[in-house]
Amino acid sequence: MLKIIIPSIMLIPLTWFSNNKKVWINVTSYSFVINMIALVTLWQVNDITTNFSTMFSTDSLSSPLTMLTIWLLPLMLLASQKHIKNQTDFNKKMYISLLITLQVLLIMTFSANELIMFYILFEATLIPTLIIITRWGNQAERLNAGLYFLFYTLIGSIPLLIALISIQNTLGTLNIMLLSLDSSPQTPTWSSHILWLACIMAFMIKMP
């Protein structure tokens, strides 16, 4: 996993040290190289989990999401060049750096083994996303959109945090690998339905 995360992080100094006229082509071309590395590294044809470390791993569900995230960066760079071509060089590089930061956070989110780490990384994506919406949004209502995005995300994330704490107190772990080994029969109760609603609400709020 480090062979994907570290090159992605190194795109940030590449952005700031590149010539202003070549920053787009440099970052886009190197991000395509990272895409090829990720395609070879994360390609899985079965459901067996690929362990990279005690904190990060991928399976047949997280691998496609991670590859999709990595492929989105060069596509976003290609799609947004015309939109911010009149911006200053500093603003262009800041915009690219925020996109790279967002990609790194999402890669770590989809490959996290601990649910609490997944929660922290998932909510950390709020910061670069909020800055991109409020600073480079195309509509005049971008400030209101950023404000709504912030409050809706916070409202949805608090029940998710409470649900994770409840699961930790009940089962004694939030490790996804260990939770998958729990084969004890579970009888549906009203509290389990509330926990399910609290977990799903944080993701449903971010869908728009």
From Swiss-Prot:
**EC number(s) from the headed UniProt entry:** 7.1.1.2
Which terms in the Gene Ontology molecular function aspect does this entry carry? NADH dehydrogenase (ubiquinone) activity; ubiquinone binding
Q: What class of enzyme is it?
A: translocase
Instruction: Tell me where it mainly resides.
Output: mitochondrion
Cellular compartment(s): Mitochondrion inner membrane
Example GO BP: electron transport coupled proton transport
Which Gene Ontology cellular component annotation is one that this UniProt entry carries?
Answer: mitochondrial inner membrane
Q: Which InterPro entries match?
A: NADH4_N, NADH_UbQ_OxRdtase, ND/Mrp_TM
Q: Which Pfam families match?
A: Oxidored_q5_N, Proton_antipo_M
- 4Fe-4S recorded as keyword: no
Q: Where are the transmembrane segments?
A: 23-43, 60-80, 93-113, 114-134, 147-167, 188-208
Q: What does this protein do?
A: Core subunit of the mitochondrial membrane respiratory chain NADH dehydrogenase (Complex I) which catalyzes electron transfer from NADH through the respiratory chain, using ubiquinone as an electron acceptor. Essential for the catalytic activity and assembly of complex I.
Subunit text: Core subunit of respiratory chain NADH dehydrogenase (Complex I) which is composed of 45 different subunits.
Query: Can you say what this protein is called?
Result: NADH-ubiquinone oxidoreductase chain 4
Please name the gene that encodes this protein.
Answer: MT-ND4
